[in-house]
A protein has these predicted regions:
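Intrinsically disordered, low-complexity regions enriched in acidic/Ser/Thr/Pro/Gln residues
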Residues: 2-9, 14
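Phosphate/diphosphate-binding glycine-rich loops and adjacent basic-rich segments that engage nucleotide
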Residues: 131-137
Length: 137
């Protein structure tokens, strides 16, 4: 079993789920359907794939100030990822998790990890503890 230490960007619930490593950046506004949890952008390589319940590894985001609202809707509907791993913080996206916490919703943890480590995560089961330690199975 391999372990990786991450930096916690937003505290949230520990998670155990399959990693979904996106191969291209995504915009949550128009790129993710908040009613289904599916990648809705027809130009995205993983169009139609569900992010719900997965450890979502984002190689980047395509900015929109509405990304926070879409993530908040996903949390509220129970369709959010189990955790989010970014290679660099995205303040707008993370704001959705912070607002969800303020509204007393259980929220996924957001973590920072070097993009180079994403490759070893694809389709693996990740267990993330409260301290941001990832165990790869």
């Amino acid at each position: 079993m391999t372990q990786l230490q991450t930096e916690i960007l937003v505290k949230g619930q520990p998670a155990k789920a399959e990693a979904l490593v996106l191969t291209a950046p995504i915009s949550f506004w128009g790129g993710v359907n908040p009613k289904t949890g599916l990648i809705a952008d027809v130009r995205h390589p993983q169009h139609g794939v569900a992010i719900t319940g997965k450890v979502l590894c984002l190689p980047g985001t395509i900015g929109s100030s509405s990304a926070a609202a879409v993530l908040l809707e996903l949390v509220y509907a129970g369709l959010a990822p189990a955790a989010i791993i970014l290679h660099e913080p995205d303040a707008i996206l993370l704001l959705g998790l912070i607002v969800a916490q303020e509204m007393d919703h259980g929220t996924p943890m957001a973590l920072k990890l070097d993009r180079e480590a994403f490759g070893c995560l694809s389709h693996k089961i990740l267990q993330i503890d409260a301290g941001g330690m990832i165990s790869i199975r």
